[in-house]
Amino acid sequence: STVHRVLTRYGVARLRWLDRPTGRVIRRIESAAVGDLVHVDVKKLGKIPAGGGWKMLGQTKGGHNASVDRSSGVFNKHRQPLRGYHFLHTAIDGHSRLVYSELLADERKDTAAAFWTRANAWFNECGITVQKVLTDNGSCYRSHVFRDALGTIEHRRTRPYRPQTNGKVERFHRTLAD
């Protein structure tokens, strides 16, 4: 139509290319080659005991459910097992969308650094040399231990409170949840 030709002539973007709240054109983070940018993030997943949670068994079974899973071997300062959550650590190559993921007991700095070491070794086995890593500003990714695990790889962080920047891994976590 005529309206479309005029808008195209003046470089006006389509509505689907715009961010609804701000009206600005959405900038996409796309890497040109395999290994240019790897997105890394952690998803917190609640542990549900075998047989279901309190909605299935009733709230009176809460004490029984609390002691069901002691398999992690990780304890809090009161020597009680950390039974509330599992943490899904994920690394996704931004170009090929190749995923390395592990379900771990926590999201501490040592765990995140060890995960990255294994993920980087796995990417190397697949023939991918990682150049940059994009993470959020979580404490495990700001630590010196994680920085040392990265070595010569460039570390980029997302803007605070802006998970859309790390959208590839966020979408992967949502796909797993659905």
Residue ranges and their predicted role:
Residues S1-K61, S139, D148, R159-T165:
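Basic, flexible linker segments flanking DNA-binding modules
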Residues K47-G51, L57-D178:
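RNase H-like DDE/DDD metal-dependent nuclease/strand-transfer catalytic core used by mobile genetic elements
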